[in-house]
Amino acid sequence: MVSRSDTQSTFLSLASAVAGAGRARQDRIYRAGVSGLRPSVPTDAAGLEGAARRHMSRKAWAYVAGGAGEGRTMDANRESFYRHRLVPRMAHGVKERDLTVSLFGEDYASPVLLAPIGASALVDKDADLLTARAAAATGVPMVISNQGCSPLEDTAAAAAPAGHWFQLYWSTDEELVDSLIRRAEASGAGALVVTLDTTVLGWRPQDLTLGSLPFSRGQGIAQYTSDSRYMDMVRTKIRGAGSDSSGDVRITPAAAASLLSMARHHPGRTLRNLLSPEPRAAVETFLGTYSNPGLDWDMLATLRDRTSLPVVFKGILDPEDAERAFAVGADAVVVSNHGGRQVDGSVSSLDALIEIRRHLGDEPTLLLDSGIRTGRDVAVALALGADAVLLGRPWMYGLAVAGRRGAEEVIQNVLAELELTMALCGAKNVAGLRGTRVVGHA
């Protein structure tokens, strides 16, 4: 997202960096190859995933790559992209490709944003900041996770000038919801992305088998521990700890390691935190309040009076839910099944997008995530009705393999393949992709 003041030169710079991304990326790789140099990360989706698995711990891999139940929704996401096939067009004279799009009256250098991924400290303690810098370098806005490992304000600063949006999980504490919204506004966020599909955690066997929830070790709660309202809640919990039965913890080496992790991820010095009840109380407060199973449309409708930011509802799969979202004031929806992490055997995000676009028509702003791995996937999503997409696991895989440079290269590769696919399909711009013929759907 480009800031609202003095934006034109910044936007032109970002758009210029993306223009010609395909051939420029190929050229850099092939020229480096003359000297025996190879990319930091594999350029194919399967190779990237395999490399990431080798670089991640078992717990990190389970959380990042795992899905709900038997993984049927994750499989459906990929199968739907395999099933839908572009029909290239010839001799359209596409000398240059324009990847720019407009969302909520703002210009963006490409139709790709980085999806929010929580608990990224599983991969690197500074994962949010490293990813934000990669996003800034590639001109791709980052949707900062509500379950991040660095405070919103620090990550937002690192993401400039590409900009950022902020993801909101609706807490059981309304004052905390308001506090997070105010911080998003103050940080210069381009939109507020309210995640609807995680009012409770889905059944995730990979994490459950390991008994691993990163938040219970203090990972992924930095937006909370940097929030004044939240820390008031923590201190209230400490004062009432005499009647709290959650103090019964079996003393084991793993428990000691978890307490050390809580201390390290809590603000302040680790030694002081080890002697303080705050880190553990912060974790327990989070586990009891971070999501709200009672979230309903009436509550969502209050957002129009609580923020001036564009409001995006993430996690929509049903056409009637999409219609209701816009009726209560959403500016856009993200068609998403949370990367297959919530309901096993649900509809794929791409198939849902087709139905929602057919139901609502061309006007509403629809974004898509879940299942996107390549630039070709982005092109298919745009051709089938998405106005933009959120890219998730691939950039995290790149981060795991080669840090900031790895995340940056993954983003560059996705943009490069998207731009080349546009050229080969005869599309001069993103709007032109909407007219590209796709076979494999009714």
Task: Give the residues covered by each predicted segment.
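Alpha/beta enzyme core
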Residues: 119, 133, 175-368, 376-393, ...
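Acidic (Asp/Glu)-rich catalytic clusters
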Residues: 152-161, 184-185, 326-327
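An N-cap/entry alpha-helix motif that binds or orients negatively charged groups
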Residues: 11-105, 211, 215-220, 225-295, ...
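C-terminal helical cap(s) of enzyme catalytic domains, especially alpha/beta-barrels
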Residues: 77, 209, 349-355, 399-419
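Active-site-adjacent helical/loop segments in soluble small-molecule enzymes
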Residues: 426
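Glycine-rich active-site/cofactor-binding loop and its immediate structural neighborhood
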Residues: 108-147
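A glycine-rich helix N-cap at a beta->alpha junction
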Residues: 164-172
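Short, charged beta->alpha transition segments
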Residues: 95-105, 130, 143-155
